[in-house]
A protein has these predicted regions:
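C-terminal helical cap(s) of enzyme catalytic domains, especially alpha/beta-barrels
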Residues: 23, 78, 105, 116-138
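As written
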Residues: 6, 107-109
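A general structural signal for short secondary-structure boundary/capping elements
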Residues: 37, 82-86, 108, 126, ...
């Protein structure tokens, strides 16, 4: 992915630490960044400690679409990650829309990732503008 121009890559946080270390080394070699996606990770506190111990600096709270359909959001996971991380950038993804983005900013998200909140909006351009404005504090 890095050879194709990607600035970031993602690896699942539930995978083996050796796999994550390999991905981290590839990112470092390319001068790029790796995000560890914590979707389905059960003991986030312990996993964050393990990840930071091997040099991970970017961790993502992420709620999948099935969990969103059942009413789940990434807010609780974001709060857990923010409390557990000592030196990592924490991103949030999953179900974020223009009307909810401020909640995640207030909870301390360093990076907000929006997909369906733009792509599935009635007016994707307006949704993107609204999110951008909120990220800029407008």
């Amino acid at each position: 992915a890095f050879e194709a121009g990607a600035d970031y890559c993602t690896v699942l946080g539930c995978t083996d630490l050796l796999t994550i270390e390999g991905c981290l080394k590839a990112a470092e070699k390319a001068g790029r960044r790796l995000f560890v996606d914590m979707i389905t990770v059960e003991d986030m506190d312990a996993r964050v400690r393990q990840l930071e111990a091997i040099g991970v600096t970017h961790i993502a709270a992420h709620t999948g679409t099935d969990r969103q359909a059942a009413g789940g959001t990434p807010l609780e996971d974001l709060c857990i990650l923010k409390a557990a991380a000592k030196k990592s950038v924490i991103s949030v993804a999953g179900g974020i829309r223009p009307e909810t983005v401020e909640t995640y900013l207030a909870a301390g998200a360093d990076v907000v990732i929006v997909g369906g909140g733009i792509c599935h909006a009635d007016d994707p351009a307006a949704a993107a503008r609204a999110i951008w404005d909120k990220l800029q504090g407008e």
